[in-house]
């Protein structure tokens, strides 16, 4: 299926690109989430009429993400969790826990912005965590997991 991208999509293209994707990906994800529209003549003309507006909106989102990235760059987040004698946690630290701690420090993030490629943390220690605020803005923060007293 041919679609018009309404915003930058990772591994697919930029705003305004007409790309061919599998039907299910377009119907079940891209179109319902507002990231794309079918590439019909009417939609192409409507997109060209709104192109400047969409580009301005995307630029505003990028500037906001960069501002939040500046606040987060180099920040150390500390989370206390119950742990056993050997340093293993009872439970784990997930991206939702980390996002909650970042929000408590004063920067708005979604839990989906926190990247944990190796899964949740299950031991006390210091970890580097990537926070992807935008496709072009990825910030690394320091996470310290302590045993709760």
UniProtKB/Swiss-Prot annotation:
InterPro entries: Ribosomal_bL9 (IPR000244), Ribosomal_bL9/RNase_H1_N (IPR009027), Ribosomal_bL9_bac/chp (IPR020594), Ribosomal_bL9_C (IPR020069), Ribosomal_bL9_C_sf (IPR036791), Ribosomal_bL9_N (IPR020070), Ribosomal_bL9_N_sf (IPR036935)
Keyword GTP-binding: no
Origin: domain of life: Bacteria
One Gene Ontology cellular component: ribosome
GO MF assignments: rRNA binding; structural constituent of ribosome
Keywords on record: Ribonucleoprotein, Ribosomal protein, RNA-binding, rRNA-binding
Pfam families from the UniProt entry: Ribosomal_L9_C, Ribosomal_L9_N
GO biological process, one term: translation
Gene3D superfamilies in the record: Ribosomal protein L9, C-terminal domain, Ribosomal protein L9, N-terminal domain
Family: Belongs to the bacterial ribosomal protein bL9 family.
NCBIfam families named among the record's database cross-references: L9 (TIGR00158)
Cited function: Binds to the 23S rRNA.
Record-given protein name: Large ribosomal subunit protein bL9
Organism, as annotated: Laribacter hongkongensis (strain HLHK9)
Gene behind the chain: rplI
